[in-house]
A protein has these predicted regions:
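Exported/periplasmic ABC-transporter solute-binding proteins
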Residues: 1-204
Length: 204
């Protein structure tokens, strides 16, 4: 809001206290958030209610959701993480989640879940790779795939948004969004495991 940058990045919508009417927001793509467990876990599918209760500590043993008789290790990101903000908003666990570990990077979450057969966490869908020792569970029977993010059936997702000051006439802003809307720009987004969206280019 102080005009120190042409563009701002968000992985959520602007909040009322952030003066959304002062900005134009452009959704670049959608990112699924995978709810991940160890690749050898017997758990393949969880309901949103089960996920909520696991992260708030109401469910604390895998046997309660069809897994082995073992305590659940709940792993999350640090408080400033956009992935954490998105996940906690979707499952309504802000200020309620009880983490055994809060980690600074996606890679650390992946490593912890891969090394602990009783762990559960969340990461951007692009980071889910069974070769790294983790897998994303289905949510209400829906697989965590880019296709299901795009068609809206996999609802654990968040937007990647860029904002700029409403009424800005800086040619760099227009050129940037023209590039992102081009075939090359859209392919770069898709190559990152994200779901491209139709990008509205400023006409100033």
């Amino acid at each position: 809001t102080q005009g120190t940058a042409l563009l701002g990045d968000l992985s959520r919508d602007l909040k009322d206290e952030e003066n959304p009417d002062d900005f134009t927001a452009v959704t670049l793509c959608l990112d699924g958030i995978g709810v991940v467990v160890n690749k050898d876990s017997a758990v393949e599918d969880l309901t949103p209610d089960q996920i909520t209760k696991i992260f708030t500590g109401e469910i604390s043993n895998w046997s309660e959701v069809g897994g082995e008789d073992a305590p659940i290790t709940v792993v999350g990101r640090e408080a400033a993480s956009g992935t954490r903000d998105g996940f906690e908003s979707i499952f309504d666990v802000k200020d309620k989640a009880k983490y055994a570990l809060e980690l600074q990077e996606t890679g650390l979450v992946v490593s912890k879940v891969a090394s602990d057969k009783n762990a559960i966490g969340y990461v951007s869908l692009a980071s889910v790779d069974e070769e790294k020792g983790i897998k994303a569970v289905k949510v209400d029977g829906i697989e965590a795939t880019e296709e299901n993010v795009a068609n809206g059936t996999y609802t654990v997702q968040r937007p990647f948004v860029q904002i700029y000051k409403k009424g800005s006439t800086d040619p760099l802003i227009k050129a940037w969004f023209e590039f992102l809307a081009s075939d090359e720009g859209q392919q770069i987004i898709a190559d990152k495991g994200l779901v491209p969206q139709e990008i509205e280019v400023p006409n100033n």
